[in-house]
């Protein structure tokens, strides 16, 4: 068993609670040892909604086990009396799975209406966050969806929006605005903000829209098999994907309109999608052709995250900003084949599929790209390497759960992505100018008067002060790095910090090739000329 340190995916409970916490009249009872209610603090801190998470813990205690008792029936009774939800989801923990308790039987002894209880007996050792969330939502839809008459006007369901989703509420608002401009109403958004009654109304919509590959596809496939509902899948990340998403949606809506003898929907003028109703809906097409952005065509980018945002971001960087993609990966092995098929022709090397952050950190250190798009973990790794990084996928920090409007999808999302790419790559110049012309009292670097030596970006070993008067002081290096003289270190400091580690590494490799054992100022100049710096 690996240490649960810096994992990309949460536990099965995390996925279950993302669904139940999204809904209005659903409550989760987690049968687990005391202390596993940490999940409520996670939602309270990150979600930034006025509602308290709908989750209770049925505590498993050693003394109860010794007496052959269980607190689950009593907990279910208390939840029923206090909250009176339409549905209670009972979830096992690793501890109860090891004990092999029969949660179905224990739930029946609670006296609560069995129709109100769903024992989601997922294996917490094998199933993680995304699979658990997708499975539970699909099960709730299967339980609830009932045959319905289609709405008179064109309508859609938006499936897959869940609590703690990446920029969830802003993306939802962005899609709402697009649909309103098209003249399409929203029948149900689920699971976010939906009730069990709302789930029963799902079949009355004309089309099911599923932006996220990880969440909602199982429910959409069930609704297609059971009720013949068409599916529009894919995330509209970027200007061209958004236009294609709109065209595909209109095509599906108009097919149904023809069958019903209703008027067809036309594509509105693009200005109608803009905030002011007068200008272009996105500034990305012209911004990408400015002299400032054209310099990005030579920049190298690496992308890592969940399936949806990895695919969307690679295509956005390559197709709309013209950046060079040096590699991409995902931590969701279940969706790796889909990612490979979507990114065919975009990647110069095989897709990286791993849930070990150390492997991704090593990849970034080896490649030293000009931009990394990843999760909060890549942000930590890049901070140590002085590599620009923007977060584009869960897991995230609290700053990615914003109160303000900050979409990733749609035309407005394309503008925000372009801004984030630009500022992530460019803001480092300010620090470089301060380093180059003087810090004016701002301590961005360590004390430059200290005699030190960096090795592959790490701090130098403590050394004795060198003999005064020597023109070039050589200090021993740590690890695999080569010794650098003081004058070479001073020359290196004039290199922008965000490529400094890369220059150090390339210089040392060059020195080894020509048989040098110490990096002096002369060796540094030769390396610069040879490597085109």
From Swiss-Prot:
Protein role: Component of the dark-operative protochlorophyllide reductase (DPOR) that uses Mg-ATP and reduced ferredoxin to reduce ring D of protochlorophyllide (Pchlide) to form chlorophyllide a (Chlide). This reaction is light-independent. The NB-protein (BchN-BchB) is the catalytic component of the complex.
Listed Pfam families: Oxidored_nitro (PF00148), PCP_red (PF08369)
Name of the protein in its database record: Light-independent protochlorophyllide reductase subunit B
E.C. number: 1.3.7.7
Assembly: Protochlorophyllide reductase is composed of three subunits; BchL, BchN and BchB. Forms a heterotetramer of two BchB and two BchN subunits.
Record pathway: Porphyrin-containing compound metabolism; bacteriochlorophyll biosynthesis (light-independent)
UniProt GO molecular function: 4 iron, 4 sulfur cluster binding; ATP binding; metal ion binding; oxidoreductase activity, acting on iron-sulfur proteins as donors; oxidoreductase activity, acting on the CH-CH group of donors, iron-sulfur protein as acceptor
Organism whose genome encodes this protein: Prosthecochloris aestuarii (strain DSM 271 / SK 413)
GO biological process, one term: photosynthesis, dark reaction
Reaction(s) the record says it catalyses: chlorophyllide a + oxidized 2[4Fe-4S]-[ferredoxin] + 2 ADP + 2 phosphate = protochlorophyllide a + reduced 2[4Fe-4S]-[ferredoxin] + 2 ATP + 2 H2O
Membrane listed as a keyword: no
Residues that hold substrate according to the record: 428-429
Cofactor(s) of this protein: [4Fe-4S] cluster
Keywords recorded for this protein, A-Z: 4Fe-4S, ATP-binding, Bacteriochlorophyll biosynthesis, Chlorophyll biosynthesis, Iron, Iron-sulfur, Metal-binding, Nucleotide-binding, Oxidoreductase, Photosynthesis
């Amino acid at each position: 068993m690996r240490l649960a340190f810096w994992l990309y995916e949460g536990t099965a409970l995390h996925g279950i609670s993302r669904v139940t916490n999204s809904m209005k009249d659903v409550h989760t009872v987690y049968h687990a040892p005391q202390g596993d209610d940490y999940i409520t603090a996670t939602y309270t801190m990150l979600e930034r909604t006025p509602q308290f998470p709908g989750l209770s813990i049925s505590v498993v205690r050693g003394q109860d086990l010794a007496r052959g008792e269980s607190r689950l029936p009593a907990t279910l009774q208390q939840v029923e009396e206090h909250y009176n939800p339409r549905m209670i989801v009972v979830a096992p923990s690793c501890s109860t799975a090891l004990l092999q308790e029969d949660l179905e039987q224990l739930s029946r002894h609670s006296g609560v209406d069995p129709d109100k209880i769903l024992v989601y007996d997922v294996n917490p050792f094998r199933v993680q966050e995304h699979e658990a969330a997708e499975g539970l939502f699909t099960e709730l839809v299967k339980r609830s969806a009932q045959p319905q008459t289609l709405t008179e006007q064109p309508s859609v369901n938006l499936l897959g929006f869940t609590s703690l989703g990446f920029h969830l509420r802003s993306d939802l608002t962005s899609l709402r605005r697009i649909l309103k401009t098209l003249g399409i109403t929203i029948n149900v958004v689920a699971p976010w903000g939906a009730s069990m009654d709302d789930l029963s109304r799902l079949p009355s919509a004309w089309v099911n829209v599923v932006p996220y590959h990880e969440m909602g596809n199982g429910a959409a496939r069930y609704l297609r098999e059971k009720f013949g509902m068409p599916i529009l899948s894919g995330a509209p990340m970027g200007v061209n994907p958004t236009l294609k998403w709109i065209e595909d949606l209109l095509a599906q809506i108009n097919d149904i309109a023809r069958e019903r003898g209703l008027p067809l929907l036309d594509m509105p003028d693009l200005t109608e999608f803009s905030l002011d109703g007068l200008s272009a809906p996105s500034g990305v097409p012209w911004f990408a052709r400015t002299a400032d952005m054209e310099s990005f065509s030579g920049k190298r980018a690496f992308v890592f995250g969940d399936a949806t945002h990895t695919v969307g971001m690679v295509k956005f960087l390559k197709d709309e900003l013209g950046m060079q993609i040096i590699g991409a990966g995902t931590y969701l092995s279940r969706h790796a084949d889909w990612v490979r098929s979507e990114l065919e022709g975009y990647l110069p090397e095989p897709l990286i599929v791993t849930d070990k952050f150390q492997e991704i950190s090593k990849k970034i250190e080896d490649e030293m790209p000009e931009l990394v798009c990843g999760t909060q973990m890549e942000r930590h790794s890049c901070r140590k390497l002085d590599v620009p990084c923007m977060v584009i996928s869960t897991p995230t920090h609290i700053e990615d759960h914003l109160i303000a409007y900050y979409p990733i999808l749609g035309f407005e999302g394309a503008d925000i992505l372009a801004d984030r790419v630009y500022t992530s790559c460019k803001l480092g110049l300010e620090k470089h100018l301060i380093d180059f012309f003087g810090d004016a009292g701002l301590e961005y670097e360590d004390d430059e008067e200290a005699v030190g030596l960096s090795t592959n970006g790490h701090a130098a070993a403590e050394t004795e002060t060198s003999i005064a008067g020597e023109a070039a002081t050589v200090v021993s290096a740590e690890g695999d790095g080569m010794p650098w003289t003081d004058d070479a270190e001073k020359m290196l400091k004039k290199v922008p910090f965000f490529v400094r580690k890369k220059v150090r590494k390339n210089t040392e490799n060059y020195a080894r090739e020509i048989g040098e054992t110490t990096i002096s100022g002369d060796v540094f100049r030769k390396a610069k000329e040879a490597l085109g710096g």
